[in-house]
Amino acid sequence: MNIETIDHIGIRVADLDRAMTFYELFGFKVIHKADNDPVAVVKNDEGVELNLVFNANDDNGGDNILMDIPTKYAGFTHVAFRVNSVLETVNILNANGIAITQGPVKFGREGHVSV
């Protein structure tokens, strides 16, 4: 398995606008935010990318498949690795007793795949 880099880190937030403003203090710029989209993508000049996911409270009703607990709280949800081959990575994980519980699922931009 060849991990090329960390692609991004997902963070659940209770207030998307407040979170975007907070990360702007650290030099992050919003590179993706669509109307009615509960995700904002921010990136700094060094290339660190964060996915800010707004559905950190039960009142919003949003499910996040990337958190395998029933109650959703603000905080870390996932780290995404960029690999040279998703199929090879899945095969290596399976061969080492690591179960893939979902996917691969294509989503988002630039051919992202979730497992």
Predicted regions span which residues?
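Vicinal oxygen chelate
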Residues: V41, F81, V90-V115
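Short, flexible, mixed-charge acidic loops at enzyme active sites
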Residues: F54-D68
